[in-house]
Amino acid sequence: MRADLLELIEPFRTDESVLFAVVYSIDGTVLASHIKSREWIPTLEWAEKEVEVVARQVLEENLNSVEFRLGKEGILIRPISRSMLLVVGISDAASLYKVRIDTESLRVYD
């Protein structure tokens, strides 16, 4: 399972505009991650706290994704299964539209 999740976030490793890509369980546990720099760890700690609340909203309201802007950076949270969320951090230069498209087809069935 972990290998499948690492494969899922692999395309984000080479995208210069992606700061981090993390798969969380709905309780906020990190299942797989790629972080370009240690400076994003505080942002990921914030995301961990938000994942449980956002997961509930996404699943109850049947949302495709939730987006946050934190200063110049953006965070896209998208469900990839009933029990997992993908969190992608993007730089200001990133095309949010491109990241939305890149993550739209990602699904893991549990």
UniProtKB/Swiss-Prot annotation:
Entry protein name: Uncharacterized protein AF_0774
Organism the protein comes from: Archaeoglobus fulgidus (strain ATCC 49558 / DSM 4304 / JCM 9628 / NBRC 100126 / VC-16)
